Amino acid sequence: MTVLIHVLGSDIPHHNHTVLRFFNDTLAATSEHAREFMVAGEDNGFTESCPALSLRFYGSKKALAQAVIAKAKANRRQRFFFHGQFNTSLWLALLSGGIKPAQFYWHIWGADLYEVSNGLKFRLFYPLRRIAQGRVGGVFATRGDLSYFARQHPGVRGELLYFPTRMDPSLNAMAKERQRAGKLTILVGNSGDRSNQHIAALRAVYQQFGDTVNVVVPMGYPANNQAYIDEVRQAGLALFSAENLQILSEKMEFDAYLALLRQCDLGYFIFARQQGIGTLCLLIQADIPCVLNRDNPFWQDMAEQHLPVLFTTDDLNEQVVREAQRQLASVDKSGITFFSPNYLQPWHNALRIAAGEAE
């Protein structure tokens, strides 16, 4: 039997760390198809912190792609599970036959599916990638992303799967300890990445609430982002008074980030695609409602779980936010499919499907 190989095709430290730790701590002990990884980027201590995994690291996305293609050609029974997919060479290999459809299973992370960049090289590449995506053996994704993908590629198998957000189920009831009143605190974006469209989001928040709310913008990730942080701060201070605007430019440890989220009353996410599911989960767990772009298909996942959804086009005020908080507080968090531990069984199923052991 050939063991499934997992591929992290881009050097995205935060996401790669989450995936590797999840496999090491949760999946590797019970499945031999959860132990082999090929990773773009440096080790950064992963080998030491994930002893249950066999990890091979590659200095560039191209080097990793070449290694994957060589393995795929050497053994056509070898299957790969691609987590996210921001590696141009791998899509081209699928398109050209270097990797066969039956070898290619893909967990969609959101940004790898949507065509949002206006850069010339991306606009030229998107049509090729779209064709290649129709040739994968199967995809795993959120309900909204599955719906989006199926409209383009109805013949490709799709299974529900959620990114393994680090969550403590014991905190599901913790939000009820806090009394919510007074000035609203609004979280804008889930990171410092430009995809959050921070400036447009700040303007939208100001249009809805004026300079009457506290605005928190976490921008400590990714690194080397100071110029953009300064740009966002300048735009924010043109709208909000200094005491109402908090731009966080330092990377935060998980517990500190969790504590920050729990001080908020509302999350505001203007991007028109599925992303930031980890932050959304942690907010929902704390009974903090989220404002989404109507083009972000994750609202379908939230509605399926009977969670209140607010949209950027809604008329928002404190009364609307407090009512959404009340509705969230009435939801039994233990039954939400994209919460831990409920997302575990779909991962076991995904491993068996990608490995060819399940129909």
Swiss-Prot record:
Involved pathway(s): Bacterial outer membrane biogenesis; enterobacterial common antigen biosynthesis
Keyword Cell membrane part of the UniProt annotation: yes
GO biological process entries: enterobacterial common antigen biosynthetic process; fucosylation
Domain of life of the source: Bacteria
Record localization: Cell inner membrane
Topology of this chain in the membrane: Peripheral membrane protein
E.C. no: 2.4.1.325
Family indicated by similarity: Belongs to the glycosyltransferase 56 family.
Annotated NCBIfam families: PRK02797.1-2, PRK02797.1-3
Name of the molecule in the record: TDP-N-acetylfucosamine:lipid II N-acetylfucosaminyltransferase
Natural source organism: Salmonella paratyphi A (strain AKU_12601)
